[in-house]
């Protein structure tokens, strides 16, 4: 359970660690003598004292969180396509603005650690196109990650700016990332790198044009495909195809088909604003907004988030919820 800290009421100025029953230096316990031929007694090292986390005076863990939506990563900018150059610039911009990449489910489950004073940002990728994750072959025929695909660019950015982090949530369709001979290897590789796999359904249907059972069947078909590569992988999030939910939204949340069950914690929309923090009263995990990654929308919303009390800023402690007292009424009430 998280502890709550209201900044205006109890900003901690100093932390003192008191060690009880510790003998003075001159009275340190000598190493016991042992009979000849006996192994020496190894004294345990003294326990480490963890350094206290820095106090982040502007921490706001009820602030808004940008969840960015990408589709194709290609040479030229276009509709539903981000150019390779612009994607690189997006990551540089996010780093310089103080953001750290987190996987969707890790952050909203409270498992992602955002460094103190930095802000979380979730990158999502729909449609599992080849430009998101591509293999190339060297002269010896060995595979390597294309440095101009999304995964390659993310790895390069992380090497340049470790505080940016390495994360991303990829919403898969059937036959993900092209290169059909490598798709299973790619899914396992992505999980090994720490990325999150989400569902975008197998065939990307219009949910409002098919039956509930057809929806369940399509979701399960994608899940079974993922299990071929990563057995038992729990898909936590589903991006609604075309941003259209079923008439009964819960049909896409959990269910089963032919004895195979699925259970999603998060449903992703197509637009169109920053998301609410996990502990905000308006956070709705079954309708998570995203920001399309275009020059206009990124500039507009990232500038907006720089306004007072708008942006999530981490205190660095996952066990404590810190926020300005002006937002006291915005905290989600726990039952």
Q: Residues of each region from the PLM?
A:
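Hydrophobic single-pass membrane-insertion segments
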Residues: 17-28
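Positively charged n-region of N-terminal signal peptides that target proteins for export
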Residues: 1-4
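C-terminal active-site subregion of NodB/CE4 polysaccharide deacetylases
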Residues: 30-124, 129-137, 142-145, 209-335
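Generic enzyme active-site microenvironment
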Residues: 124, 171, 198
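A short alpha/beta connector and helix-capping loop motif
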Residues: 134-159, 168-170
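Substrate-binding clefts and substrate-entry loops adjacent to catalytic sites
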Residues: 198-209
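Acidic (Asp/Glu)-rich catalytic clusters
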Residues: 58-60, 114, 154-165, 179-198, ...
